[in-house]
Amino acid sequence: MRKRFFVGIFAINLLVGCQANYIRDVQGGTVAPSSSSKLTGISVQ
């Protein structure tokens, strides 16, 4: 049960990170890295 909980958190973090990257791409890459991308550990290039 505990393993499923951690997998769920990981999936949510992944979705949030991908959504932040998508929004940044749509707006031309002018958006500064948000706190959500830092929390998920996604490096912004």
Curated annotation (Swiss-Prot):
Membrane topology (UniProt): Lipid-anchor
Cross-referenced PROSITE patterns: PROKAR_LIPOPROTEIN
InterPro entries associated with the record: Lysis_col
Pfam families, alphabetized: Lysis_col (PF02402)
Signal peptide (residue range): 1-17
GO BP terms in the entry: cytolysis
Single GO cellular component term: cell outer membrane
Reported function: Lysis proteins are required for both colicin release and partial cell lysis.
Protein name, UniProt field: Lysis protein for colicin E1*
Taxonomic source organism: Shigella sonnei
Lineage: Bacteria, Pseudomonadati, Pseudomonadota, Gammaproteobacteria, Enterobacterales
